[in-house]
Amino acid sequence: MKKFLLTTSTIAALFAAGITGANAGNSASVYQGGKHNTGVFTQNGYHNKGTIDTYGNRNESKAVQQGEWNYLYQQQLGNRNSALTDQYGRDNYAVTGQEGRHNTATTVQTGRSNTSGIAQIGNNHKAVTDQYGSNNTSATIQVGNGQKAKTVQTGHGNTSVVIQGGY
């Protein structure tokens, strides 16, 4: 019975949070340590924000924001890594940091002020940044091991910097 009540109240709380979070001041945080990790959140309209911190082991995280002020931050330390950031409209801004092991980071931004930063240190790297319309700006830094970077920018301010160094 206790398990049922706990599960029911958890579902109710998540449902309520989803309704208010979809069109309010938004904000989301996921902090994880060790083992099989995976962090996911989706936000819809208004003030958005973000943050996903993952420490060690199999990692993987996905964050999706849709409209208004956006902002996102993802950090992954150690092991199999992989981070996806999708932002669609308005002030955008995304930062992804990865350290150690298989890495891979993808940032997709669509319209407005854009800005993307990806830093990868150690092991098999690979970074993709897609920006489409408005002020754009992209920086990718990769140090040590696999490297690879791809940046696609389409209309408006554009600017892309890729720095790669080995050891």
Where are the regions that the model predicts?
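Positively charged n-region of N-terminal signal peptides that target proteins for export
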Residues: M1-T8
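Low-complexity repeat regions of mature extracellularly deployed or surface/particle-associated proteins
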Residues: A24-Y167
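Bacterial N-terminal signal peptides
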Residues: T8-A17
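Sec/Tat signal peptide C-region and signal peptidase I cleavage site
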Residues: G18-A24
